[in-house]
């Protein structure tokens, strides 16, 4: 009987864990509009007022949201649209068109996507239009019920806005902004970009039709605010089905935020990037370790997640190299030390390696030159070294100038973790200069 009870309690616990993971993963991955905004309240107020003027009063406009990747541009617009759609009578009478510069790579594809999102495929049918502007104006005309006041407002959201500026003649941007300046269908054009020089990319005729409204997003919060965000992002909502479990989870999150080792991890993360996307990645990796037998996140989970986040990919490649390839990298390191980061060629590296072999008088490192050349080429394929200029057909491979793409710290850290690294090779790496 007791085994049955323990089985059922384990199943209930597993169900709670899966619900926790679903809620938090949705929060971390999909930037759910149900979450909170951090440090952008002023910008949010500006944006929502602009959208309301279009949706309620039929006022056309255009605006750019500018900020580095991960600063919350998409989250800001999603929150604003959610609030707008909750206003009575707005959701039925407003249309949204979402375009992305990475997907809609030219105006023709963009126009097809606009047609699809506005559900106007049946209106266009087999009609033939002379120009892009004619086609677009016909589509917008189809949305009109009568005069300006009764036309259906359209919100155009252009993600990766700077890529649309590279379209031929910027026809799409010109026509959308032209409509926003004229007394036609009420439209608001919202551009999302990470480029501060975006206005310099616009043609004069496009720039003259843009309202020059801009919202800048910069992650300017302090570490105490970052710690508060950490707590809020990990905490379960009050509507969680099991109150007792949610209370225990939130108490654990509170104790984590006060833990010294956790604060150190978060401080390191904060110093590298204030980007909330990188914080979400850290929390996601820690959340993956939660199981029915390990129901709460611990400080050790966060420390391990931080190690995974800050893992050096090039350093990891070095762990899988052969001893010969490691020796060549050490030879390059010494050449960099002697010649102060000047480029080197294979012959120089080979000579440096030979000094080590002769000094140690080891037959184990006595490789034929073609074998050493093959190892050198493998390092180039792994992109641990790169040629300084394009390879000429007639150029001898031994004398092509190369540059090492690892610094001394990366090499030494990788050697510390290298499995069964020979002692004399490690000593050679730590010697101040080469074997002169």
From Swiss-Prot:
GO molecular function terms noted in the UniProt entry: ATP binding; ATP hydrolysis activity; DNA replication origin binding; nucleotide binding
Protein role: Component of the origin recognition complex (ORC) that binds origins of replication. DNA-binding is ATP-dependent. The specific DNA sequences that define origins of replication have not been identified yet. ORC is required to assemble the pre-replication complex necessary to initiate DNA replication. Binds histone H3 and H4 trimethylation marks H3K9me3, H3K27me3 and H4K20me3.
Source domain of life: Eukaryota
A GO biological process held by the record: DNA replication initiation
Protein name: Origin recognition complex subunit 4
Localization (cell): Nucleus
Chief place where the protein resides: nucleus
Entry keywords, A to Z: ATP-binding, DNA replication, DNA-binding, Methylation, Nucleotide-binding, Nucleus
Recorded GO CC terms: nuclear origin of replication recognition complex; nucleus
UniProt cross-references to Pfam families, sorted A to Z: AAA_16, ORC4_C
Binding residues annotated for ATP, in chain numbering: 67-74
Residue positions, PTM N6-methyllysine: 7
Organismal lineage: Eukaryota, Metazoa, Chordata, Craniata, Vertebrata
Assembly notes: Component of ORC, a complex composed of at least 6 subunits: ORC1, ORC2, ORC3, ORC4, ORC5 and ORC6. ORC is regulated in a cell-cycle dependent manner. It is sequentially assembled at the exit from anaphase of mitosis and disassembled as cells enter S phase. Interacts with DBF4. Interacts with POLQ.
Similarity-based family: Belongs to the ORC4 family.
